[in-house]
Each structure stands twice: as C-alpha cells, then as structure tokens.
Amino acid sequence: VLATNGYLYEIKEAQTFVTNLSTTMALDKLAESKGSMVIRSAVGEINVVRKMNETNSDLGGEGNGGVILREAHLGRDSLVAATMILNCMSQTDKSLGEIYKTLPKFKFIKDKVDVKGMNLDLLNKKVTNLFKDAEKNTLDGIKFTWEDRWIHLRKSNTEPIMRIYAEAKKYKDALNLITQIKKIL
C-alpha cells in the first residue's frame, strides 16, 4: 500500500492495479481515493502478472510486499517497493510514519484448518448461505466481501489445509468472520 501510494504520488493520474484476492482492501480504498481501481487475480505471482498483461496494468503485487512494476520487470521486487516509498518520502518531504498515518488501515488475520475428511462442496454451500449478504468471488477458493471487511477461504496447493484470511476495520470483526466459519466446520 505504501509503494502504491508512492507510485500514485509520482504518476498523478488514474491507474489500474492488480493484486491477489488475499491482499488488503486498504489498497482498494487508497485507489478509490485517487480515482484509480484495483483488479484482483488468483493468489500467486504468475497469476498477478498474467492479469497485469490482460489489463495492461503497469503496477501489481501481492500482500507480502512484493511489488511488480512493468517498467522494471514482471516479477516481484522488494527493492522496487522500497524505491517507490523512498521516492514518495523525498517528493513530499514527509517521514514514513507521516505517510503511513494518511493511509487506510485494516486488521488482517490468517488462520488455517485441516481439510482431511472435510466435504469442501458442503462447506462451500454452508458458507455461501451464511454470508448471503456479501459479494461472492470464486476465482481462487471462495471470498466474501462487504464494504468494510472480507473473508477468503482457499485450499492450499502444498498442504492438506484450507487457509482462511479475514480483514476488517476492527480486529474483533475480522476474528468474528473466522469464528463463524469455524462454527460450521
């Protein structure tokens, strides 16, 4: 989010950014405030890059801080992110803390559950019924989004687990989303 803020400060025009489904919605809120937009891809650097190519986006990345800037190369690069942040600090004459204070804030929780013996189709039906009032996305697992919070469930490609990510303005609201999921398992 800090790197994107730096990029927007430098470019000064509306942009389209690509990030995965599990990345903070602070990026969406920042983009909206600058007349820009965020497009979501499946989790994974290759998926972000593919979506960047499809949408002709110049900036993408994942929530781990790996920024992808087409101008540099189509791969995650933490040095690009650091440079973008430092450039913003230089251009605004503000400290990192001062810039950070201006950005949207959300509380993010990661959890996981064992999927051995779990009927994932039944779970998806139960979760869809539970979160009927949310926008549903099944691009990569299942994600439910509201204006101020979201929850994303996706089966791991490397372990017999389901990863659960939740985010909200308040920690207790993100935790409540995960608690609701665990109650129906």
Predicted regions and their residues:
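Cysteine protease catalytic core and zymogen-processing segment of caspase-like enzymes
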Residues: V1-Y7
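Phosphate-binding and adjacent anionic-ligand microenvironments
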Residues: E10-L185
